[in-house]
Structure formats: structure tokens, C-alpha cells
Amino acid sequence: MSVTTKDVAYIAELARLKFTDAEQEKMASELNMILHYIEKLNGIDTEGVEPLSTIHDQINVLRADVEHTPLSNDEALKNAPDSQDRFFKVPKVIG
């Protein structure tokens, strides 16, 4: 399987991204390198190798939960660039 610049252009259109021709060439090359690596991984014999659920033998290494008072809405919105009706106001991102 090989990724062409046409494939990159199609995927970019779906994601609403714009690439120059040079960027499309580079992206196609990088995606082809990734696919080549995956093909190498698929060729590895893993017969008899037990799957890992984790790479560490340690369990419960997360921090302990500590109860604390959360920020009030006013405190949280104090640093917001824009707010409306006690909510963060952000620019529209979907057409």
C-alpha cells in the first residue's frame, strides 16, 4: 500500500486542512514511511509471546486523591479572554 499526494489532498479536504504541494509531498513521504514501519512490525513473529497489559509490574502508582475546594465560576472566568453568562466564550470554529 502506498500513499499518494492525491490521497493526502483527499484526507486534508476531509479534515478541512490546506497543504501546499511541497507539504503534500512531504506528508505522503512521511505516511509511506509509517506504513512501511507497520509492515515491518506485521512481519515480526510473536508466536508464544504473552501479551502485555502494562509494561510495569507496579500498580496504583497514581497520586492519592486530595479533597480541596474548587475554583468558583468567577475565579475561573477571571482570566478568560471573553465570557458570556458565566461561561467561557470562544470563537466559532465550525462553519
Curated annotation (Swiss-Prot):
InterPro entries: Asp/Glu-ADT_sf_sub_c, GatC
Pfam family, one: GatC
EC numbers: 6.3.5.-
Catalysis: reaction(s): L-glutamyl-tRNA(Gln) + L-glutamine + ATP + H2O = L-glutaminyl-tRNA(Gln) + L-glutamate + ADP + phosphate + H(+); L-aspartyl-tRNA(Asn) + L-glutamine + ATP + H2O = L-asparaginyl-tRNA(Asn) + L-glutamate + ADP + phosphate + 2 H(+)
KW Phosphoprotein (keyword) present: no
Any one Gene Ontology molecular-function term assigned to this protein's record: glutaminyl-tRNA synthase (glutamine-hydrolyzing) activity
Domain of life according to the entry: Bacteria
NCBIfam families reported for this sequence: gatC
PANTHER family the record matches: GLUTAMYL-TRNA(GLN) AMIDOTRANSFERASE SUBUNIT C, MITOCHONDRIAL (PTHR15004:SF0)
Role played: Allows the formation of correctly charged Asn-tRNA(Asn) or Gln-tRNA(Gln) through the transamidation of misacylated Asp-tRNA(Asn) or Glu-tRNA(Gln) in organisms which lack either or both of asparaginyl-tRNA or glutaminyl-tRNA synthetases. The reaction takes place in the presence of glutamine and ATP through an activated phospho-Asp-tRNA(Asn) or phospho-Glu-tRNA(Gln).
Quaternary organization: Heterotrimer of A, B and C subunits.
Name of the protein described by the UniProt record: Aspartyl/glutamyl-tRNA(Asn/Gln) amidotransferase subunit C
Source organism (scientific name): Chlorobaculum tepidum (strain ATCC 49652 / DSM 12025 / NBRC 103806 / TLS) (Chlorobium tepidum)
